[in-house]
Amino acid sequence: MTLEAIRYSPGSLQILDQLQLPEHCHYEALSSVQQASEAIRAMKVRGAPAIALVGCLSLAVELRAGAGGPGLAALVAFVRDQLRLLVAARPTAVNMARAARDLGQVAAQEAEREGATEETVRERVIRFAEDMLEKDLKDNRSIGDLGARHLLEQTNPRGGKVTVLTHCNTGALATAGYGTALGVIRSLHEMGRLEHTFCTETRPYNQGARLTAFELVYEQIPATLITDSMAAAAMAHRGVSAVVVGADRVVANGDTANKIGTYQLAIVAKHHGVPFYVAAPSSSCDLHLETGKEIVIEERPSQELTDLNGVRIAAQGIRVWNPAFDVTPHELITGGIITELGVFAPEELRGALSASVFSEGQTLDSPWV
């Protein structure tokens, strides 16, 4: 049985409440964009691709129930307002913003078509949102295959096995299924070329310990959990062949926003001569921004750092800085950026993706919503 972060059928959306993992597998029904926004903000669902999918599918559920209108203009305005609410839930990940732009345009274009009705606008937006599920899974499979083959060519072309270190959670729980960085690891395992996986606990939210370790055990992939502070020692003494991480936003020059702690992993990897890869769909690539300095970094509540399962573990009165993400400079991404379209050096990204990512009249100046 495959792990599912999202269960969807027309008119019905359920998410696996990831706050309850690994102790309990509980699915929560979402019937509105407001509920989806709250679930995203609370991190019941997380991972840039999954956030976009849940957001758009929650809108599809609302529209199928007849929300929006009356009138075409009011319906298009409703769609755009709901999309803005979803984008604001967690602003660092670009996938939701890109999906909001696309869905908003789909609604507006359909409304302008001769003979358009509220029903045709709803159907067009719903169909677009539902198609995202299939596309994300297909893209993940491509990322896994392309990334695994490139990694093997660069690190062990003679046919041996490799050991990979990863950070946070980038598997089936963060996507429509299979995963991005964890998809590369899964592909290596399926090819019989994976020796071992090291996954970091990923403090302070412990996505690695709670979610990635859960997926690896579930899929029977050989793995060891380490603390974040053990990564350098693992690279020095445990034969790490490559580091593969995901991304919440990759900008035009290749700078990458990902879970806090990614930046220091890239520095350590470069010191040890270990190739450092970013695995992300093209929907996570934001060519509107030139460098990582322009990325808005979400900051999380202090309690996520000072409390554990409701128990205070830090001194009262201590100040807390709790950014959810950091930005890895492109020059530290030495292995490449793995997308469903190929594996690219950071400096190749803009040219390689421009025609594909910004198709159908989109430009670098096109607004997200």
From Swiss-Prot:
Pathway noted in the entry: Amino-acid biosynthesis; L-methionine biosynthesis via salvage pathway; L-methionine from S-methyl-5-thio-alpha-D-ribose 1-phosphate: step 1/6
Spans through the membrane: none
Active site: D248 (proton donor)
Function: Catalyzes the interconversion of methylthioribose-1-phosphate (MTR-1-P) into methylthioribulose-1-phosphate (MTRu-1-P).
InterPro entries: IF-2B-related (IPR000649), IF-M1Pi (IPR005251), IF_2B-like_C (IPR042529), Initiation_fac_2B_a/b/d (IPR011559), M1Pi_N (IPR027363), NagB/RpiA_transferase-like (IPR037171)
The protein's name: Methylthioribose-1-phosphate isomerase
Keywords assigned: Acetylation, Amino-acid biosynthesis, Cytoplasm, Isomerase, Methionine biosynthesis, Methylation, Nucleus, Phosphoprotein
Biological process according to GO: L-methionine salvage from methylthioadenosine
Omega-N-methylarginine sites (modified residues): R158
Pfam family, any one: IF-2B
EC number(s) per entry: 5.3.1.23
Residue numbers bearing the N-acetylmethionine modification: M1
Keyword Amino-acid biosynthesis: yes
Localization (cell): Cytoplasm; Nucleus
GO function term, MF aspect, one: S-methyl-5-thioribose-1-phosphate isomerase activity
